[in-house]
Amino acid sequence: MNQPLVSIILPVYNAQNHLARCVGSICAQTYSNIEIIILNDGSKDQSLPVCEAFRAKDPRIVLVDKENSGVADTRNLGLKLAGGKYVQFVDSDDYLDPDFTAAL
Protein backbone atom coordinates (compact mmCIF):
# COMPACT_ATOMS: atom_id res chain seq x y z
CA MET A 1 0.00 0.00 0.00
CA ASN A 2 1.26 3.47 -0.89
CA GLN A 3 1.91 5.58 2.19
CA PRO A 4 1.26 9.31 1.73
CA LEU A 5 4.03 11.64 2.82
CA VAL A 6 3.56 13.16 6.27
CA SER A 7 5.38 16.40 7.09
CA ILE A 8 6.38 16.70 10.74
CA ILE A 9 7.08 20.31 11.68
CA LEU A 10 9.25 20.98 14.72
CA PRO A 11 9.89 24.60 15.79
CA VAL A 12 12.92 24.85 18.09
CA TYR A 13 13.92 27.63 20.46
CA ASN A 14 16.47 27.07 23.23
CA ALA A 15 15.50 23.43 23.63
CA GLN A 16 18.88 21.72 23.98
CA ASN A 17 17.81 19.82 27.11
CA HIS A 18 14.87 18.06 25.42
CA LEU A 19 15.77 18.12 21.76
CA ALA A 20 17.71 14.87 21.36
CA ARG A 21 14.91 12.85 22.93
CA CYS A 22 12.29 14.64 20.84
CA VAL A 23 14.04 14.33 17.48
CA GLY A 24 15.09 10.77 18.25
CA SER A 25 11.46 9.83 18.85
CA ILE A 26 10.44 11.43 15.54
CA CYS A 27 13.16 9.59 13.62
CA ALA A 28 12.07 6.29 15.21
CA GLN A 29 8.50 6.44 13.89
CA THR A 30 7.20 3.14 12.50
CA TYR A 31 5.57 5.11 9.68
CA SER A 32 8.57 5.76 7.48
CA ASN A 33 7.30 8.06 4.72
CA ILE A 34 7.91 11.27 6.63
CA GLU A 35 9.78 14.49 6.14
CA ILE A 36 11.00 16.13 9.32
CA ILE A 37 11.15 19.90 9.08
CA ILE A 38 13.16 21.33 11.97
CA LEU A 39 13.12 25.11 12.24
CA ASN A 40 15.66 26.60 14.63
CA ASP A 41 14.12 29.92 15.63
CA GLY A 42 17.28 31.78 16.62
CA SER A 43 18.20 29.60 19.60
CA LYS A 44 20.98 30.95 21.78
CA ASP A 45 21.85 27.58 23.37
CA GLN A 46 23.23 24.45 21.71
CA SER A 47 20.00 23.52 19.93
CA LEU A 48 21.41 24.09 16.45
CA PRO A 49 24.37 21.67 16.83
CA VAL A 50 21.98 19.02 18.17
CA CYS A 51 19.77 19.50 15.10
CA GLU A 52 22.75 19.40 12.75
CA ALA A 53 23.92 16.10 14.24
CA PHE A 54 20.52 14.51 13.58
CA ARG A 55 20.37 15.95 10.06
CA ALA A 56 23.76 14.38 9.29
CA LYS A 57 22.33 10.96 10.20
CA ASP A 58 18.85 11.13 8.68
CA PRO A 59 18.19 12.36 5.11
CA ARG A 60 14.50 12.88 5.90
CA ILE A 61 15.43 15.93 7.99
CA VAL A 62 15.22 19.42 6.53
CA LEU A 63 16.89 21.94 8.83
CA VAL A 64 16.21 25.66 8.65
CA ASP A 65 18.21 28.07 10.83
CA LYS A 66 16.47 31.44 11.03
CA GLU A 67 16.28 34.59 13.09
CA ASN A 68 13.89 34.52 16.01
CA SER A 69 10.37 35.45 14.96
CA GLY A 70 8.21 33.49 17.38
CA VAL A 71 6.55 30.11 17.28
CA ALA A 72 3.53 31.09 15.16
CA ASP A 73 5.67 32.56 12.37
CA THR A 74 8.02 29.59 12.58
CA ARG A 75 5.16 27.09 12.25
CA ASN A 76 3.81 29.04 9.27
CA LEU A 77 7.20 28.82 7.57
CA GLY A 78 7.17 25.08 8.23
CA LEU A 79 3.78 24.83 6.52
CA LYS A 80 5.13 26.67 3.49
CA LEU A 81 8.02 24.20 3.25
CA ALA A 82 5.93 21.09 3.87
CA GLY A 83 5.44 18.75 0.95
CA GLY A 84 3.34 16.14 2.70
CA LYS A 85 -0.30 15.28 2.21
CA TYR A 86 -0.66 15.45 5.98
CA VAL A 87 1.05 17.65 8.58
CA GLN A 88 1.88 17.01 12.22
CA PHE A 89 3.14 19.69 14.58
CA VAL A 90 5.50 18.62 17.35
CA ASP A 91 6.93 20.81 20.10
CA SER A 92 10.58 20.46 21.07
CA ASP A 93 9.77 19.09 24.52
CA ASP A 94 7.46 16.37 23.15
CA TYR A 95 8.35 12.69 23.04
CA LEU A 96 6.44 10.65 20.48
CA ASP A 97 5.30 7.07 20.82
CA PRO A 98 6.78 5.06 17.91
CA ASP A 99 3.30 4.62 16.37
CA PHE A 100 2.25 8.27 16.75
CA THR A 101 2.40 9.05 13.03
CA ALA A 102 1.07 5.65 11.96
CA ALA A 103 -2.05 6.30 14.05
CA LEU A 104 -2.80 9.43 12.01
State what each model feature region is.
Residues 1-104:
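Nucleotide-sugar donor-binding/catalytic module of glycosyltransferases
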